[in-house]
Regions:
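Flexible, solvent-exposed loop/hinge segments and secondary-structure transition points
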Residues: 1-142
């Protein structure tokens, strides 16, 4: 089974934060999860709120566990709130259904994991995360 290496996870984090600085975003927090939803790498920039790890992880966790992007999860939550409520019941409240959760795929389309970015608007979080994933030579789906 293909996976995100620790080196690639660190690259994703580093390049996501660099993109955030380039875009002049608020301080970001970034987590990279493997295909089982386990953290591989996390960083919280100076000035980011201490609770941002759980938000970043929740964005990524929903993506990897359901095979959906953060945008798709948001849309599903708006259309069928009962679905996301049920999912959060099943996953102990760990799913945050908003953009900034990004599926990570290899070139064959296999899901390798997910990235969660938080700190600015959800759309800006997603843009920064996509840049980090691309810099690691992987494919992001926000």
């Amino acid at each position: 089974m293909a996976s995100i290496t620790l080196n690639k996870a660190r690259t994703i984090v580093r390049k996501t934060l660099a993109k955030g600085r380039e875009m002049e975003l608020k301080p970001l927090s970034v987590v990279v999860l493997d295909a089982g939803g386990n953290p591989l790498a996390f960083e919280r920039e100076d000035g980011a709120a201490p609770g941002r790890f759980e938000i970043a992880r929740g964005k990524a966790y929903g993506c990897v566990m359901l095979g959906m992007t953060g945008t798709q999860l948001r849309d599903r939550a708006e259309a069928q709130a009962y679905f996301v409520t049920s999912v959060n019941g099943a996953y102990g409240g760990r799913v945050i259904p908003v953009p900034g959760g990004i599926l990570v795929r290899d070139k064959r389309g296999q899901v390798l994991g997910a990235v969660g970015v938080t700190g600015d608007t959800s759309e800006n979080d997603a843009e920064a995360g996509l840049a980090g994933i691309e810099a690691a030579g992987l494919i992001g789906e926000a």
